[in-house]
């Protein structure tokens, strides 16, 4: 939602990151609950602007 991205580019990114998913899942299973969280106001604002963007997520 943060950047205008075509469907093919989005699929390429997902394919590239797919091999890291098991590693990230394993790491997340051992993180203490106190360390899990986020404070990302810029991401929230950018996501809210997504709705009115000319180019939207996976626009064909």
From Swiss-Prot:
Coiled coil: none annotated. Disulfide bonds: none annotated. Induction: The probable operon is induced by urea. The keyword Chaperone applies. It is found in: Cytoplasm. Keywords: Chaperone, Cytoplasm, Nickel insertion, Plasmid. It comes from the Bacteria. GO terms for cellular component: cytoplasm. UreD, UreF and UreG form a complex that acts as a GTP-hydrolysis-dependent molecular chaperone, activating the urease apoprotein by helping to assemble the nickel containing metallocenter of UreC. The UreE protein probably delivers the nickel. Required for maturation of urease via the functional incorporation of the urease nickel metallocenter. Belongs to the UreF family. This is Urease accessory protein UreF. The gene is ureF.
């Amino acid at each position: 939602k943060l950047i205008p991205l075509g469907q093919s580019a989005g699929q390429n990114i997902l394919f590239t990151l797919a091999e890291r998913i098991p590693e990230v899942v394993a790491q997340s299973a051992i993180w203490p609950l106190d360390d899990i969280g986020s404070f990302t106001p810029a991401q929230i604002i950018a996501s809210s602007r997504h709705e009115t963007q000319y180019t939207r997520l996976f626009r064909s």
